[in-house]
Amino acid sequence: PNAMRTHFNFTELKDVLKWKTTDYDVLYSHLPEHTDQLVNLFSNNTNITPKVVGYCHWYEVPENTAYNKTMLMANFAGMLEMEECGVNSEWLKSLVLEKAGDIYQDTYVDKLKNIIQPHYLGIDKVDMKSKPKGKSIVFNHRDNDYTGFRWFVKQMDKLYEKRQDFTVYTTLTDMNKPYSKRMKIHSRDEYLKFLKTMRVGVGCFDKYSAWSIATTDSLSMGVPYVLPNKLCYPEMVGKDYPLLYDKDF
């Protein structure tokens, strides 16, 4: 599943670089797992030493993956080669430094602390005039454990026992429930237009959520979201946001 983090074709990449006729000032890496190898390629096989910067939105940690083996150590090694590595949030930076502290001495953790910096993801369109239709709830997240999908379905089942006047809309998975409907959407404009018809959105993230574009997409279209008062969400919407909840599940 994590082959993109493990596979590095040194020979092919060296040929593609055409380094004898092309100069490189900056190396930008979105996969820190490859950065150590990229720096090695440039340093030992060319006469070019570009500055290295990057970004990482996903770290293989127990909170979000059940792999027997991960590429986290390669990720750390890659980030240590960077001038700066952007991450989605302060929450994610804190989590990564905590994991690094289990392995490295303080000297290296402090170096990572200076390298890793939050680079908040923006939104490409804002239209706060939502036009909700009916009692509609949107769950536009993956059906993974870290998104709280199974817990969410159980809560909707309980709600359906009490009332049958609502519809849950999903965009990435089928719930196969009498109260649910999956939307098959073919463009971003169509997706944003659909979001504007939702009454409320829900985020049930439990142990891991460094950011949620699904949430910011909906907020930018004027859709209020019920969100956990932990992970990145107080940072995203502000601690005084009225729809943060504290209950764990």
Task: Write out the residue ranges for each language-model feature.
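Active-site proximal beta-strand in glycosyltransferases
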Residues: 26-28, 41-63, 79, 84-86
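Conserved acidic donor-binding segment of nucleotide-sugar-dependent glycosyltransferases
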Residues: 239-249
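A short, active-site helix/loop in glycosyltransferases that binds the activated sugar's phosphate group
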Residues: 78-113
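Short beta-strand->alpha-helix junction loop in the catalytic core
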Residues: 91-92, 110-128, 175
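Conserved catalytic-core segment of nucleotide-activated headgroup transferases in glycan assembly
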Residues: 124-126, 133-178, 188
